[in-house]
Amino acid sequence: MEGISITKLLVIAVLIVLLFGTNKLRTLGSDLGAALKGFKKAMNDETPAAKKSDGAEAAPRVENKE
């Protein structure tokens, strides 16, 4: 099996540009970039439930005795 060649990828890219137009693709890329930026920001922000309170200590570690 050959896979997808460069010429096939170029033909697919040209068809996509012809179907959607450059303006629609530009707005789609912009919207996708904004969505990814928002997702990354949400993943990096700590939620209040994930923060440890000042008075709380970690539970002692329990090991199995056999």
Swiss-Prot record:
Signal peptide: none annotated. It is found in: Cell inner membrane. Its main location: membrane. The keyword Membrane applies. It holds the Pfam family TatA_B_E. GO terms for cellular component: TAT protein transport complex. Residues 46-66 are annotated as: Disordered. It comes from the Bacteria. It is a single-pass membrane protein. One of its GO terms (molecular function) is protein transmembrane transporter activity. The chain crosses the membrane at residues 1-21. GO terms for biological process: protein transport by the Tat complex. Keywords: Cell inner membrane, Cell membrane, Membrane, Protein transport, Translocation, Transmembrane, Transmembrane helix, Transport. Belongs to the TatA/E family. TatE subfamily. NCBIfam families: PRK01614.1, PRK03625.1, tatAE. Part of the twin-arginine translocation (Tat) system that transports large folded proteins containing a characteristic twin-arginine motif in their signal peptide across membranes. TatE shares overlapping functions with TatA. This is Probable Sec-independent protein translocase protein TatE. The lineage of its organism: Bacteria, Pseudomonadati, Pseudomonadota, Gammaproteobacteria, Enterobacterales.
